[in-house]
Amino acid sequence: MTRSDWLKQALVIPLPDDPALVLDGCRRLLGPNLYGREPGAVGDALCEGALRDRVLQAWPDYLAQLLAGLEWDAAATVLRPFDGGVSLYLAAPIDRLFTGAYVIEAAWHLCACALLGRAAPDMPVLLADLRAIMAHEANPALRALADKAEARGLDRLLDDDWVTFGHGAGAVTWAIDDLPAQPDWTAVNDIPVALVTGTNGKTTTTRLIAAMGRAVGVISGLSSTEFVKVGDEVLEKGDYAGPAGARLLLRDPRLELAVLEVARGGILRRGLPVGHAQAAVVTNVASDHLGQYGINTVEDLAQVKLSVHRALRLGGQLVLNADDALVVAAAPLSMQPVWFSLDPANPLIVAARAAGRACGWYQGGSLMLSDGATEVALIAAADVPLSLGGAARYNIENALAAALAARALGLEDAPIRAVLASFRSDPADNPGRANAFSVNGARVFVDFAHNPHSIAAVTSALAALPAKRRFVLLSHAGDRSDEDIRGLVSGAFALRPDVVVVAENPKYLRGRSLGDVPALMRQRCLELGLRADQILAADRPAVGAEMILDLVQPGDLALLLVHDDRDQIFAMLGQRGTLG
């Protein structure tokens, strides 16, 4: 049994069973995180009203007692109240992360027992159990190596059984229980790394930056919601916008430049994967996947996204959307972000230019960049295929963010410009992002947009394109609220559709019954003004796509919002139409 296997089952603390006081889970944060730059552990408790006020006092008090009993000195803690509960974070050395999670859980047990008037475990016995775990987890060799790496300015990747210092072509990886006494540090180094997060646009921005790296002749790679890729090789397909994808990418010995798409879930579950990035981008923040880990509002979500700044190395650049009020409000006061905007009169852009700080903006049809000393017109939006002639303003934002991040990675303007001029919305360069096809003289677009904000952005851009008739395919997974599903339909109506096909998503019911989601979508279409005969039904997305392709005629426009059957739909379009 490995050390980590033993630690995962080392202690079972019988938590009080009462719906008024629920520990929603404890987890280890392996890198910089929402609460701080150091790794640690966090627990989320669900409690309401006056009981929550008592938890705010009692839980950290019991944690302090346990830490004192364990002679755990100078441990930073963060108490974060939220609507309906409390989160408690404990910073911990890298060889006390399991112990930290158990200590938080034990402190909760003592707290809940006291508040519920129940018998608590004997403190000396509980401390003895925790000391045994701490002794078993202790790894002085790991701590010593981590200190030496930090002194040399080297980054660290950590999981349950392995530790890596440096990145990619400069990385070394060892089993945590088999560490060298005197490693050769001469070949260990970090490589340029960028992090990209946000509610929408992060995948496109990630792909753009990686393409810019390839354009200068280095082996660049990315981890994303679609795959992990090094050069032209896809290492794994799937949602890898978390620490596991980052580790898979950054441990590849061929890698010379890395771009990590970073999702909300990965940040909250395990923290950020790196601590020495040269650039971090936040594209925007909108309501999405709220209600988990105590993140209940879009303001909370903005704080999660902005925590990427804690993964920056000294001198790294934080690239932020100056047009997003949530991003602006959450921006760390300790930093001078590199702002980008579609409006040259945005006060943050005006201030940055006046102060001689780097920034990017859109003016007179061109993407403008400043390094603080020189301002250049990088490229005209009309020459950026992703912008759809300037109609897709969200992709102008993504292009500005990518260009500024690429500059932060040390890339010159020529390859940045070349990628923006050649990178297309097609299944090769940017699969699932407004991919354009021609079928029977109609323009057909495929997009994987999955929330009201992203759907509204796509449909608003396509609404500017002329069309005789407009078709939309709608479907979605069942793990959205009724309000969210209605919002998805409302966002799609920016396209002013003449026909909507509502498709069931049988593999993604996620707690709902067959027909629930299509019924909600159909009702919202009726409320927004479509007649019943303008709303068609399909039992799968691929069937719905085929129905639309059978109906389109020259001059029509169709948007297929695809959640499932992606490969089948792309194959269908390849057989019945052409790219472009």
Predicted regions and their residues:
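Short polybasic amphipathic segments
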Residues: 162-166, 226-229, 365-372
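Preference for protein termini
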Residues: 1-192, 216-219
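Residue-level signal for inorganic ion chemistry
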Residues: 149, 223, 261, 283, ...
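Adenine nucleotide phosphate-binding catalytic loops in nucleotide-utilizing enzymes
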Residues: 295-302, 306, 335-456
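ATP-dependent carboxylate-amine ligase
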Residues: 1-78, 84, 392, 404-414, ...
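Flexible active-site lid/hinge loop adjacent to a nucleotide/diphosphate
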Residues: 230-339, 344-348
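Walker A (P-loop) phosphate-binding motif
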Residues: 182-227
